[in-house]
């Protein structure tokens, strides 16, 4: 059974099971030793944290931003064979590859509007006509 060594505490763990290692890493002595380790690391002169004054840190500090990664060919439109492969294809192609026809777009479905229930229809002319008759009847009297 392997023994596990804690570099922060400088001890070999007596319980090498995952539960024993987890319990050790959550302990007070381990946490204080870990904090002390990183504080000592920052105090040493060779370790200088990067300073970005009002700037965003570079994503890839060592690489120039070219749009593509080194070693990769740039992106090309579909259906075009890269220049270096034209003569390297076995059998050789007589010319450029004809373009592939576009994928047909399916016709959109006709929207279905549900019918209203027959009892819910309101006939505005009928209500207006009855209102007109009532007012004319009251004025005629």
Curated annotation (Swiss-Prot):
Localization of this protein: Nucleus
Alphabetized UniProt keyword annotations: Metal-binding, Nucleus, Ribonucleoprotein, RNA-binding, Zinc, Zinc-finger
GO molecular function, one term: pre-mRNA 5'-splice site binding
SMART domains the record matches: ZnF_U1
HAMAP family noted in UniProt: U1_C (MF_03153)
Subunit and interaction comment: U1 snRNP is composed of the 7 core Sm proteins B/B', D1, D2, D3, E, F and G that assemble in a heptameric protein ring on the Sm site of the small nuclear RNA to form the core snRNP, and at least 3 U1 snRNP-specific proteins U1-70K, U1-A and U1-C. U1-C interacts with U1 snRNA and the 5' splice-site region of the pre-mRNA.
Membership in a protein family: Belongs to the U1 small nuclear ribonucleoprotein C family.
Free-text function comment from the UniProt entry: Component of the spliceosomal U1 snRNP, which is essential for recognition of the pre-mRNA 5' splice-site and the subsequent assembly of the spliceosome. U1-C is directly involved in initial 5' splice-site recognition for both constitutive and regulated alternative splicing. The interaction with the 5' splice-site seems to precede base-pairing between the pre-mRNA and the U1 snRNA. Stimulates commitment or early (E) complex formation by stabilizing the base pairing of the 5' end of the U1 snRNA and the 5' splice-site region.
Full protein name: U1 small nuclear ribonucleoprotein C
Native species: Theileria parva
């Amino acid at each position: 059974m392997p023994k596990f060594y804690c570099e922060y505490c400088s001890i070999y763990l007596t319980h090498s099971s995952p539960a024993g290692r987890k319990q050790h890493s959550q302990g007070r002595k381990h946490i204080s030793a870990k904090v002390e380790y990183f504080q000592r690391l920052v105090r040493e002169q060779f370790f200088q944290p990067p300073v970005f004054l009002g700037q965003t840190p570079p994503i890839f500090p060592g690489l120039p931003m070219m749009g593509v990664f080194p070693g990769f060919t740039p992106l090309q439109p579909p259906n075009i064979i890269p220049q270096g492969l034209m003569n390297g294809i076995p059998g050789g192609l007589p010319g450029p590859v004809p373009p592939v026809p576009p994928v047909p777009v399916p016709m959109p479905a006709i929207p279905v509007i549900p019918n209203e229930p027959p009892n819910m229809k309101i006939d505005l002319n009928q209500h207006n006509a009855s209102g007109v008759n009532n007012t004319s009847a009251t004025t005629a009297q």
